[in-house]
Amino acid sequence: MITGIHHVAIIVSSEKSVDFYKELGFQEILRKVREYDSIVLLDATGIRLELFVDPSHPPRSEKPEQLGLRHLAIKIDNFDELIKKYNCDTPKYDWLGERYVYIPDPDGLLVEIHE
């Protein structure tokens, strides 16, 4: 029986992405440096991201509709403050009636921010 999602692993090209997710509210709880990359484990209220920091990986496709992770969606309590900070477009409403915006991380992965 599944009891939850343990973590989401994302390959990123630099510490800029680590900083981006920290600015969204994630906290670094563990870091491991290996010969070929670094692994940074982030947590926000039990939601964990495992970032593999490696500048040698090819860049992400510009088309999010390809196979694999399309976007990461998170819910925050400072929605209006965040959309001003990132100069976002006017928020939209999803099919559940919730406000959201998309913000690309430094490597182009879309992060869907929900109120």
Locate predicted features.
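Core segments of cupin and vicinal oxygen chelate
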Residues: I10-L49
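N-terminal beta-strand motif that seeds the catalytic metal site of vicinal oxygen chelate
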Residues: M1-V18, R70-L72
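A short, acidic/glycine-rich surface segment
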Residues: D37, S56-E62
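Mid-chain, well-packed structural core segment of small domains
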Residues: E62-Y93
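Loop/turn position at the start of each blade in beta-propeller repeats
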Residues: T3, Y36, L67, L96-E98
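Vicinal oxygen chelate
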Residues: V40, N87-E115
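Residues at or immediately preceding the N-termini of alpha-helices
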Residues: S14-E15, F79-D80, P106
